[in-house]
Amino acid sequence: MDKGRERMAAAAAAAAAAAAAQCRSPRCAAERRGFRRELDSWRHRLMHCVGFESILEGLYGPRLRRDLSLFEDCEPEELTDWSMDEKCSFCNLQREAVSDCIPSLDSSQSTPTEELSSQGQSHTDKIECQAESYLNALFRKKDLPQNCDPNIPLVAQELMKKMIRQFAIEYISKSGKIQENRNGSIGASLVCKSIQMNQADNCLQDEQEGPLDLTVTRTQEQTAQQGDGVLDLSTKKTSIKSEESSISDPSSENAVAGRLHRNREDYVERSAEFADGLLSKALKDIQSGALDINKAGILYGIPQKTLLLHLEALPAGKPASFKNKTRDFNDSYSYNESKETCAVLQKVALWARAQTERTEKSKLNLLETSEFKFPTASSYLHQLTLQKMVTQFKEKNESLQYETSNPPVQLKIPQLRVNSVSKSQADGSGLLDVMYQVSKTSSVLEGSALQKLKNILPKQNKLDCSGPVTHSSVDSYFLHGDLSPLCLNSKNGTVDGTSENTEDGLDRKDNKQPRKKRGRYRQYDHEIMEEAIAMVMSGKMSVSKAQGIYGVPHSTLEYKVKERSGTLKTPPKKKLRLPDTGLYMTDSGTGSCRNSSKPV
């Protein structure tokens, strides 16, 4: 029995331990979550059924319930939803046309006008009352604010009151116009027109006191502008206006036809004046050689026959009549087409003239630095002037050679670099840059003209490397006109080109252009580079410090230092020529040799 009790106690202890340590299986975890969710729901249901006050009373006693009863009278009363009043002075306001006052009409007017004036007086009284009620509803007061801020002057107060009243009157008058148009009442519209005229008179009288109002006199300004304005050559507005006038009033067709006839006569006179001015400009351009007859006719909109006639009449001293030609031109084409074409061609001619003047000015400004006189001709004559520029450049260099000028001494001091290029060389390189930019900006230089220029100039690919810029260097530059002057690298007072000393090399590279330099990292002084390499290899400077002091490229300096110290991962191939044979031996640095009978 004792053993059985011990076993049961051990099982109970194991069950308690198992209950204390939660099972990690997903099934047990799901069941536990379900139990927790159900307990939470029971808690909410208990609070909903029993009531929160009862739970608080059971927890804290009846004193809390008694304290909460003090706030029962403080709850707001229930209010009905807001609804708009049946008759609101602001929402349901009868709006009609209004004015400040209608003056008494003259006795000479007829009886219908007197009846209309009496109706207008009654309308005016109603509208004034409506304006007052509108202002009262707007400001939520019975009367307008009489007592304003004492700091505001009296003149400003009166002006503000007048502006507020004018705003109310105009607002009601505009809404009244809309209602009258919907109802179709003709008599009321006449009253509105008379009221608007009276408002215009009142505004003209009160110009000095009140602010300027442009809304009333806008129609009068439009009619004045139409009468005194410049003639409009567009066909859309005139056609639309003529159609509207013919539809609205058929009796005004004769007046419209007469107006169009006068406009057409005015157009013919103006077009003749414009044509005379354009004709004189076209003849000047043709005589100066800037344009030929075909281009001048297209740009200025003048027939070629007319230009030929005037060119023939100029030497004889008898100017041809251009008005007859314009009449024939207007007869051959319709009125609308000739008008639009003339306007477009006039704009095109003015634009082309401005463009040519702008290009000529830019060319002159570009060549002022090189002390050359570039001809002020059209851009398509550019290839004919290159030869003249070459000759002038040659004469200038010959005159500079007679001047004895010692080249400046190059100081090899750290942090100080002196340019070793002579004055003539600097002028030559700047000139080549200018000529290159001019050749690139000229858009009419075609391939055929360039080929002719290459045939004229001598074909020399080798440049002189011992003196200043010579004629052969300029010729070879123009021979390869599509290259930048950066290809002619300035170094140590010389101009470097593709160096081939033998005739075989020249024959092989007759049809090839020189290789372009790879960038500014090759433009350095070799002596300064040698000094920088020596400083780095001796350990006195690092590569970065030597680059900053001597101004040499960092990558080139580092490569040359590693090459001379033998620390390159892939050393360059060495070319060694055997003394006895004409063979070249290539050593790749790995111990393998290879012979080749052809030099690389």
Swiss-Prot record:
GO MF, any single term: DNA binding
Its job: May act as transcription activator that binds DNA elements with the sequence 5'-CCCTATCGATCGATCTCTACCT-3'. May play a role in spermatogenesis.
Keyword flag DNA-binding: yes
Domain HTH psq-type: 515-567
Annotated localization: Nucleus
GO annotation terms (biological process): regulation of transcription by RNA polymerase II; transcription by RNA polymerase II
Chain residue numbers at which the record places covalent cross-link Glycyl lysine isopeptide (Lys-Gly) (interchain with G-Cter in SUMO2): K241, K318, K339, K396
Pfam families, sorted: HTH_psq (PF05225)
DNA-binding region: 543-563
Ranges annotated as biased composition (Polar residues): 105-122, 587-600
Protein name per UniProt: Ligand-dependent nuclear receptor corepressor-like protein
Keyword annotations: Activator, DNA-binding, Isopeptide bond, Nucleus, Transcription, Transcription regulation, Ubl conjugation
Expressing tissues: Expressed predominantly in the spermatocytes of the testis. Also found in the kidney, liver and heart.
Disordered: region residues: 103-124, 239-260, 494-521, 564-600
PANTHER family in the cross-refs: LIGAND-DEPENDENT NUCLEAR RECEPTOR COREPRESSOR-LIKE PROTEIN, TRANSCRIPTION FACTOR MLR1/2
Family matches, as InterPro entries: Homeodomain-like_sf, HTH_Psq
Entry's Gene Ontology cellular component terms: nucleus
Chief location of this protein within or outside the cell: nucleus
